[in-house]
Amino acid sequence: MRILLTNDDGIHAPGIHALWRIFDDWADIFVVAPDTERSATGHGITVHQPLRVEKLSFANPHCHGWAVNGTPADCVKLAMEELLAEPPHIVISGINRGPNLGTDVLYSGTVSAAMEGVIYGVPSIAVSVTGWHTADYTVAAETTRLLCEKLVARGLTPDTFLNVNVPDLPRERIAGIQVTKLGSRRYQNIFDKRTDPRGRTYYWMAGEVHDVDAGEGTDISAVNAGAISVTPIHFDLTNYSLIQEVSDWLGGGSSPFADRNKKDDVETKRKA
C-alpha cells in the first residue's frame, strides 16, 4: 500500500506528522507538501516561476518526504508525475488546522489537493480539525485511518473524494459520524490598510464569518453537534437543474447571432 500525504499548512505542520504516524504499520508513506504554509490557495498551480524540491529525511524508514515551494495542487502534480516511482493507492490531504466547511472548500488548499488526487484517478480524502489551536490530532488521525480502510475495501465513484471535518473534542465527546452535504459560510472581509516606509499602500486581508447556513444535514450542523462530518464531493460543478432553463433563454441552441447576421446581410445587399 502506498499513501501520498500532502497539506496546505506546510510539511512541518503537526497534522501531517500525525497522519504518517497513524499509517506507519499499514503503508509506505510519501509526503509531498509545501515548504511553508499555503492556506487558502485554492486550486492554484505555479506556472510563472520554477518549482523547487528538497528531499527530507524522516525517522521512519517507510516514510519519504519532499518539501516543495509551491501550492498543494503543485505538490500532488509533482508527486504523481515526477517524484513517485509508482502512483499511490490513496491521497490524503491534511490534517488541516481549522475547519473546511461549506463554501470554505472553494478556497481551501487542503480540499483542492484531494481534488487533484481525484483528477488523477486516485481515491482521495481531505481532513480538517475544526479547532485553530489544536494540540492533539489523534482523533482526526484515527478517523482518517478508519475511512481509508473503508475506502480501500469499498471504493468511491472515480470523480468523488471525501471532505472530513473532525470536531476539536476528546474522543469520548465525539457524537458519531454523519455523512453530510455542504452548508454555507460567508465572510465579511476585513482589509487593514497600511503604508510601507516608501509611502506605498498595502493591505492585510482577514475576515469573519457572518452568514452561516447550518441547516439539517449540513457539514456545519454536524460539527456543531459534536459529530464528525464526512461529505462526498465531486469536481463536476454543473447545475444540471438549470441546463434547460438557460437553454431556453438562448433560443434552444439556435445561433445567438442569427438576427444580427440577417441584418448584416440586408445591409450588405442595400450597399451593393
Curated annotation (Swiss-Prot):
Enzyme class at the top of the EC tree: hydrolase
Presence of keyword Chaperone: no
Catalytic activity line of the entry: a ribonucleoside 5'-phosphate + H2O = a ribonucleoside + phosphate
Keywords from the named record: Cytoplasm, Hydrolase, Metal-binding, Nucleotide-binding
The UniProt record lists the keyword Nucleotide-binding: yes
Compartment(s) where it occurs, according to its Swiss-Prot or TrEMBL record: Cytoplasm
Binding site for a divalent metal cation: 8-9, 39, 96
Cofactor note: Binds 1 divalent metal cation per subunit.
GO molecular function: 3'-nucleotidase activity; 5'-nucleotidase activity; exopolyphosphatase activity; metal ion binding; nucleotide binding
Cofactor section: a divalent metal cation
One Pfam family this sequence matches: SurE
Cellular component GO terms held in the UniProt record: cytoplasm
Source superkingdom: Bacteria
EC number: 3.1.3.5
NCBIfam families: PRK00346.1-4 (NF001490), PRK00346.2-2 (NF001492), surE (TIGR00087)
Function: Nucleotidase that shows phosphatase activity on nucleoside 5'-monophosphates.
Family from the record: Belongs to the SurE nucleotidase family.
Protein name in UniProt: 5'-nucleotidase SurE
Species of provenance: Heliobacterium modesticaldum (strain ATCC 51547 / Ice1)
Underlying gene: surE
